[in-house]
Amino acid sequence: MLSPKRTRFRKQHRGRMKGISYRGNRICFGRYALQALEPAWITSRQIEAGRRAMTRNVRRGGKIWVRIFPDKPVTVRPTETRMGSGKGSPEYWVAVVKPGRILYEMGGVAENIARKAISIAASKMPIRTQFIISG
C-alpha cells in the first residue's frame, strides 16, 4: 500500500475539491491512460487494487505508471466514542483527485489489451473515468 514515509503534520483538514485538475492532466509516460471525470478521494487500497488488476492483465511487455499518490491522512474516531476530546487518529491515506486527473498510464502493449486492462482498473475506482490515448 502507498503512503508517505513521513509528513510535517500528522493530521490535516478535510478541505474541498473545487474545480478541475490543472496538474497531472496530460499523458506523460505511456500511450494509454485512465482519466478521472469526477472529484473524489481515492484510497491507497483502491489505487493498489487498480494497479494489481492492470498488472495481471498486461502480464509481461507492458509498463504501468501510477500517476497519483495518497498523501492526505484521513482520521477516524473510535466507534461508540462521545464527542469532544480531540480529533481522531490517522487511519488511512487518500489521494485527492479532481476531474481531468490522470490516474494510471500504460505503454508497450496493443490498444485492445490496454483497453481491457484499464477498464478492469476503472471498475475498482469509486468514480467515473475515461480511457484516453496520447496524440
Curated annotation (Swiss-Prot):
Natural source organism: Vitis vinifera (Grape)
Question: Per UniProt, which keywords does this protein have?
Answer: Chloroplast, Plastid, Ribonucleoprotein, Ribosomal protein
Q: Which Pfam families match?
A: Ribosomal_L16
- Using the record, list the residue span of the signal peptide; answer none if the entry has no such feature: none
Q: What's the name of the protein?
A: Large ribosomal subunit protein uL16c
Q: Which compartment or compartments is the protein found in?
A: Plastid, Chloroplast
Q: Which family does it belong to?
A: Belongs to the universal ribosomal protein uL16 family.
What terms describe the molecular function in GO for this protein?
A: rRNA binding; structural constituent of ribosome
User: What does the entry give for GO biological process?
Assistant: mitochondrial translation
Note the subunit structure: Part of the 50S ribosomal subunit.
Tell me the lineage of the source organism.
Eukaryota, Viridiplantae, Streptophyta, Embryophyta, Tracheophyta
GO cellular component labels:
chloroplast; mitochondrial large ribosomal subunit
Q: Which InterPro entries match?
A: Ribosomal_uL16 (IPR047873), Ribosomal_uL16_bact-type (IPR000114), Ribosomal_uL16_CS (IPR020798), Ribosomal_uL16_dom (IPR016180), Ribosomal_uL16_sf (IPR036920)
Output the HAMAP family linked to this UniProt entry: Ribosomal_uL16
